[in-house]
From Swiss-Prot:
The keyword Ribonucleoprotein does not apply. Belongs to the LarC family. This is Putative nickel insertion protein. Pfam families: Ni_insertion (PF01969). It comes from Trichlorobacter lovleyi (strain ATCC BAA-1151 / DSM 17278 / SZ) (Geobacter lovleyi). Gene3D superfamilies: mk0293 like domain (3.10.20.300), Transcriptional regulatory protein pf0864 domain like (3.30.70.1380).
Length: 394
């Protein structure tokens, strides 16, 4: 599986995203040719890119030149378009199906965020900054680049909130602007940055529509690294978006899981054991407890569990109900799971399931326990016999 990880700790914008994809190898001529399928007039824009310095780092800067553009500002004049107009333009184009789908997903995120921020119907949303030709190029260009690179999955780091104020078509707004703040829901953010708009609406929409936020960079085999430079220079950090392109290890499946934990100092061993049983019965991937020293020198236990994201609410409810804790910590993480399958083997002691992976085979614990109880044998003896017979058959 080919994945792309965006290190957006310094920020992200639409032009920076396209610049990263160009730096990863997408030809500018291909981008230009594919954008021509949108049906915009030939004279609507001219594309260029160049290597620039941002705070001691080198990155590619992507520029959309407009016929009426003056100076270096990307939004001197705006072609106001409604979400319905843009949706129809993409649908009617001759772009590839996947490019259309990705573009529509991004614009839908933008439209819904703008509608909520300004209290209008989605189809009545008028894009100003986003509706300009250069931003349409940024969004559809991102989709074209991801398709050309054959990216299967996108991940992103935490993004900076920024600070201060920004001038928009709706007036002077705090950073992040209302629509951007809406788009940041569900994404990891940090405040370890100076003032200024570090995440634009277009950049936030790209992440909200296509990327899975992660606390740590996923385990991957990196093949290329791209650097996309923003238009501004910041005093605190280089205004660079990095993209790591690579593959997940073939022998493992990659998945997102959650770790939930809480500190306990007023539960009995019986209550703790019962809670763990209930969590396993509810589908927790793993549950354990760790002795800890708490405040006021009190001994306690840290109860921890792993679960899938969709199980979170049920698990939190169970932990609070059974332990009486007032809070549960949550951490999202990635794990690599060895590909495996189950084989059923007929042994001299009975039927035993074996878990098979590239690392070897292992009899199922529960099956071995059942046989040990039924035959009055030691568990380790049962495991030795069934392993030997399984290996002999193979």
């Amino acid at each position: 599986m080919r994945i792309l990880y965006f290190d957006a700790t310094a920020g992200i914008a639409g032009d920076m995203t396209v610049a990263v994809l160009l730096d990863l190898g997408v030809p500018l001529t291909h981008l230009n040719n594919e954008l021509g399928r949108l049906g915009l007039p030939h004279e609507a824009f001219v594309l260029s890119d160049e290597q620039v310095q941002r705070g001691g780092m080198t990155g590619r800067h992507f520029v959309v030149h407009l016929p009426h553009q003056h100076g270096h500002h990307r939004h001197d004049h705006h072609d106001h378009r409604s979400y319905a107009d843009i949706r129809q333009m993409i649908a009617a184009s001759s772009l590839a199906g996947r490019v259309k789908d990705l573009s529509q997903q991004i614009f839908m995120q933008l439209a819904e965020a703008e509608a909520k921020a300004h209290q209008v119907a989605v189809d009545q949303v008028q894009f100003h900054e986003v509706g300009a030709v250069d931003s349409i190029v940024d969004i559809v260009g991102t989709a074209i680049g991801l398709d050309w690179l054959k990216v299967d999955r996108v991940y992103c780091s935490a993004v900076p909130l920024g600070g201060g104020f920004v001038q928009t078509a709706h007036g002077r707004l705090p950073v992040p602007a209302p629509a951007t703040a809406e788009l940041l829901k569900g994404l990891a953010v940090h405040a370890d940055c100076g003032a200024g708009e570090r995440v634009t609406p277009t950049g936030a929409a790209i992440l909200a529509a296509l990327a899975e936020p992660v606390t740590n960079m996923p385990h991957m085999i990196i093949s290329q690294v791209g650097h996309g430079a923003g238009s501004r220079d910041f005093a605190d950090v280089p205004n660079i978006l990095r993209g790591f392109l690579g593959e997940l290890p073939e022998q493992a499946d990659h998945e997102t899981i959650l770790e939930l934990s809480c500190n306990l100092d007023d539960v009995t061993p019986e209550q703790l054991g019962y809670t763990m049983e209930q969590l396993f019965a509810a589908g927790a991937l793993d549950v354990w407890h760790t002795p800890i020293q708490m405040k006021k020198q009190r001994p306690g236990q840290m109860l921890s569990l792993l679960c899938r994201p969709e199980q979170k609410d049920r698990m939190v409810q169970l932990v609070m109900k059974e332990t009486g804790t007032l809070g549960v910590r949550l951490q999202q993480m990635q794990r690599l799971v060895q590909q495996r399958r189950i084989e059923v083997c007929q042994t001299s002691l009975g039927t035993v399931r074996f878990k098979i992976s590239q690392q070897g085979s292992k009899p199922e614990y529960e099956d071995c326990c059942r046989i040990a109880r039924e035959r009055g044998l030691a568990l380790r003896k049962v495991q030795q016999i069934v392993r030997r017979e399984y290996c002999h058959e193979r």
